[in-house]
């Protein structure tokens, strides 16, 4: 696995978060130009990695956080105009080399999933089911035939603050729901936070090893 193909995030790192969000509305020409330049860099960088890998890189990790706890960070229309086309171009290059695209975006993103799929992702990563509207059963039923899922075990509640039994229950639910007929990689809903009980982390993996979807 290689890469971190962010486009939206790389752009706002350069301009500042609030400033770039304002650019999208007040100075769209500049925003488009910055995103285009970032994409050109990411495509060339990714191409060099894949060429150096000589067919041995199975997976490229990309991502742009577009979700918050309550909904999308930017409107879906803004995402479609400014962000999606650039990831389509990047993902096309990744697929040309026979690699798979795993795409990270956490938060409440249900309404964006069809467009994430349309831009060429293969694996949707993070799966923050603590966020509004995120539903494992609906994701699997609606998109599970063509999209793989990774993550889901809560780093906001279950892993840091739950009991071992809570972790076992949640892990079992996710494996049986998202893992039915394959297409699920168990993992936390984001980075495991400092102070998370080690026994809870172990319970997540031990439970998964004992289960069949």
Residue spans of the language-model regions?
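Active-site loop segments of alpha/beta catalytic cores
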Residues: 1-213
